[in-house]
A protein has these predicted regions:
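Phosphate/pyrophosphate-binding loop motifs in nucleotide- or prenyl diphosphate-using proteins
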Residues: 1-170
């Protein structure tokens, strides 16, 4: 029996909570496309749960919505190029689906940190990488469900302008 205070048990709990959060977001949505996209994410989380519980390494690469892991990384780091908007500055104007995805993205990041702590210097570091890409994929998905007029963004390369857009100069 595993000691309940180990980082592995903490990781299992976080993965379980992550799966529950996805199911909750699906349950409260009326949007079939949103529900389906979240199911794709949930399937990866379930695979990670099974791999962790059975001491198997998640070795395979994955793709979501026709994007490879490298494409997910590129799009999440260059949203203006791919989505015509800068990095998202969360705000209640983003509406329910996007706000839910933003919350989910942050929860995936928390699970990633827990996984990295649980599996320092081991073959299981792939799990950390998959979680990193999964949070990036959810970030990309957020753009799909943002209202067209949403204009709250982090602006890394331009001066702050007083145009009614909420921007933060970084």
């Amino acid at each position: 029996m595993t000691d309940k205070s180990t980082t592995r048990i903490a990781l299992r709990g976080k993965l379980d909570s992550l799966n529950a959060q996805i199911v909750f977001l699906q349950a409260v949505s009326q949007n079939p496309e949103y529900i389906s996209d979240l199911e794709d994410v949930r399937q990866i989380v379930r695979t990670l749960q099974m791999c962790e519980a059975s001491d198997e390494v998640f070795e395979e690469s994955f793709s979501l919505w026709g994007m490879s892991e490298d494409e997910i990384h590129s799009r999440s780091h260059n949203p203006a190029k791919f989505f015509g908007k800068g990095h998202i500055l969360p705000h209640h104007d983003m509406q329910k689906e996007s706000a839910g995805l933003n919350l989910l993205r942050t929860q995936i990041r928390e699970v990633e940190l827990c996984a990295c702590s649980a599996f320092e210097e081991s073959d299981y570091l792939r799990l950390c990488h998959v979680l990193n890409r999964l949070s990036s994929a959810v970030y990309i998905l957020t753009y799909k469900f943002l209202p067209e007029e949403y204009n709250h963004q982090l602006n890394f390369h331009s001066e702050r302008r007083n145009t009614g857009n909420e921007q933060i100069q970084v």
